[in-house]
Regions:
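ATP-lid-like helix-loop hinge signature
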Residues: 145-167
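Histidine phosphotransfer helical core of two-component systems
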Residues: 32-70, 90
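Conserved HAMP-HisKA connector
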Residues: 2-26, 194
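Detector for a conserved hydrophobic position within an alpha-helical segment of the HATPase_c
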Residues: 214-215
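Conserved micro-motifs of the catalytic ATP-binding
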Residues: 85-88, 124-127, 198
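Short conserved segment of the HATPase_c
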Residues: 183-194
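Conserved catalytic submotifs in the C-terminal HATPase_c
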Residues: 102, 114-124
Length: 241
């Protein structure tokens, strides 16, 4: 009964956030095109009217405005993506393969990070391959960003991500540990709330999308503070359960 209540609450919460994201995307996207056109016209019309010194300053300011417009466009696309998330197409998938595929993709982007994967055996889940793949890519990406931020502050160290699968109490338990900077907020539950982010250029929707996908898969996610780094625990029902 408690599980059903939690799932109902999560569904209602995501429906509300999807509605908000849809409205935000619509309201912000409309004025972006005329803003971009005006910027382009200003650049064309006035850049040749300045002397060399002032022209450089003018173009630099135009470049800054353009960069901010592109950032807003990126955020709008993320809002739209969150609002239009497709329904999962379920079939029997090998969980180990989904995780390995995600790890291999991340390793091509950052070869300096040691990603270790341990599993007692091969597990299968009733899942949408693309969506679960997206979950692990999102989580690994966050871990890598945390490790790189710590490296910038502390200098070089052995950057590690450990992924382990176990079967506990009728659920497949996936633990993702890293030795990065850890959770800076004292309440880890807030990380999956939409629009909460610790990044300078982020919408805070990444982990909300992760939570939404896992909820659709009858799974759970937990963010655990620890002395060094961060731990994320995912529970998924085994195929056939």
């Amino acid at each position: 009964l408690k599980y059903q209540q939690n799932k109902l609450i999560a569904n209602e919460r995501h429906e509300a956030w999807e509605s908000v994201a849809r409205k935000i995307a619509h309201e912000i996207k409309n004025p972006l095109t005329p803003i971009q056109l005006i910027i382009d016209n200003l650049k064309k019309k006035y850049s040749e009217l300045f002397d060399e010194k002032n022209k450089e300053s003018f173009l630099e300011k135009i470049k800054t405005i353009n960069k901010q417009v592109k950032l807003i466009e990126k955020l709008v696309n993320e809002f739209s993506d969150f609002a239009r998330m497709p329904k999962p197409i379920f079939k029997k998938n090998e969980l180990n393969k989904i995780i390995k595929d995600s790890i291999n993709l991340m390793k091509t982007n950052d070869k300096d990070i040691d990603i270790n994967f341990v599993s007692e055996k091969v597990y299968f889940v009733n899942s949408d391959y693309e969506q679960l793949n997206r979950v692990f890519i999102n989580l690994f990406k966050n871990s890598i960003e945390s490790l790189n931020e710590k490296s910038e502050k502390m200098g070089n160290f052995q950057k590690k991500i450990n992924v382990e699968i176990q079967f506990i109490n009728d659920y497949i338990n996936i633990a993702v540990n890293d030795n990065g900077k850890g959770f800076t907020n004292s309440n880890p539950k807030i990380f999956s709330k939409p629009y909460f982010t610790t990044k300078k250029e982020g919408s805070g929707l990444g982990l909300s999308i992760v939570e939404k996908i896992l909820n659709d898969h009858n799974g759970f996610i937990e963010f655990i503070s620890q002395k060094e780094g961060a731990k994320i625990k995912i529970l998924l029902p085994k195929y056939g359960n």
